[in-house]
Structure formats: C-alpha cells, structure tokens
Amino acid sequence: MQKIAVVGSSYFEKYVEQIKTADMFPQVELFFIPDNGAPANIDINFVLNLIEEKAIQAIVLGPFDYERLAPLISIPCYIVLPNLQDFLLLHNRVKDYKKTAVVLSPQYEIDLSSLEQCLHIKYNRFFYSQDGVKDLIRQLKADGYTGVIGNSTSLMHAEKHGMDGYYYFSRKCIEDGINNALQIIRNMERENQYVSEVRSLLESTTCGVIYTDSNMTITYVNKTAFDILHCYRDSVLQKPLTDILPSKIIERLQRSGGQESNIRTNPV
C-alpha cells in the first residue's frame, strides 16, 4: 500500500476525510498534515518527523507550502493549483459575480476568459502580496464587494468582514493531486525495479563494468571489476577514472565519441 500525505488548510483536511470515507483510493494510506493557516506557521520538524515515522512516499500541497517544504524533503511533491475546473464547480454557489472578487496570488496566473465567455459572466480579479491580503480584503469590503473567491487566508479575512467566502480549490483538485502523486510513486517503483534488475545482471556478469558520468567520474563498478582491479568500493567510487585506468585507454574512450565501447583491458 502506497502512503501519501496532503498538506494544507482545514479545507484540504475536510476533502481528505471525504475522500477516505468514500474509499476512493483503497490502495493508498492517506495522511493529512495541517499547515496551521499560513506557510510561515507550518511546523517543519513535525512534517519531517511524520514523513520518516509513517514512511510517506509523496506529498500533495499548494504552492506556498511547497516553497517551504520542497527544499527540505527528498520525496516527490505534487503541487495543486486552482484551475478552470475548480472555478466551474463553484459557479452555482456564487450569489453575485458583480460583487464577488477573485483574490489571487501574483505567483500564478489563471486564464478565466473561456469560462467568462461560456458562462456569460465577468470575474473581478485582484492580486495580492502574502503580507498585503488583509489590507486588500478590507479595501474590497469598502468598495462594496460582498464575496471573495480565494485561498484559505483570503477567506479568513473575508469572513471577518462578513463577506461570503468561496474556496477556489475543489475536492476534485485534491483527488487529481492524489492520483497524480500515486502515478509518480508507481513510476518510481517501476524504475527502481528496473534498476535493481539491471544491477543484478551487472553484478553477476563475468565482465568488469565501470560507469562514469560526463566528467569521467566513477559512479558504478561491478563486483567483477573490483576483483580484476584488486580494489574496494570506497576507494574508487566518485573518483576520476584516471585513478584506476591507464590514460591511453581513457583517451581511446574519449575519441570513440559514443556512450558504449568494446574496449577491454586484461588484468595485470
């Protein structure tokens, strides 16, 4: 069973609980990690410890949480962003588009023109900085707006001013995010299985095999090569190829210009 965590607001938490109740992903053990209302408040150590403790394989999260977490973790992160599908699913809930503001982060732009044409409406879009959302909502209220479409932070300030709040992430968006994260995990598992099979073949071959990167730094040496060269793994890995092969052989490899070569050397 694969393990996936969703990081986000209480809205995401509600979606995760609904998805778990509906048993939409029976092959996945789902976890929810709260971001405490804002990326600045997220408990990084708690997230890192939970990933290790639960052996979580991938995370689904929004763009602000991604900025904080992605540089610190080694598992795949799938970013969800509001899309046309989310705005379409909101359509029947919005009371008055003329008095409803779409509050967006300047980090990403969404083209709503096709929906405007199909639904015969006009979205009133406003962009904010992370520190300026509170002042923007206050100004929108003063300008006569009665509703806000936005993220959890925008809705928190909108509700304080008695405005209607419409969360622009739908449950379908989170479902798609989980499904995509699951596909990433499966692809990685298949790739790891393939690498394991190739490594097993290389380890059992009677020919010595050495892999290098483009800088001729050794990245892999099979058992036969170690036996031929009379060396240990730690003594050659990440070392220049010149440390174990004569320069004339390396020159021939470089002149060949290909990724493969039939050049062989006999043990001395």
Predicted regions mapped to residue ranges:
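Periplasmic-binding protein-like
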Residues: 5-6, 56-62, 102-103, 145-152
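Non-catalytic positions within long, well-ordered alpha-helices that form the structural scaffold/packing
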Residues: 51-52, 138-141
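Sensory modules in modular signal-transduction proteins
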Residues: 190-223
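PAS/PAS-like sensory domain cap-loop motif
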Residues: 225-236
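PAS-family sensory/regulatory domains
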Residues: 235-248
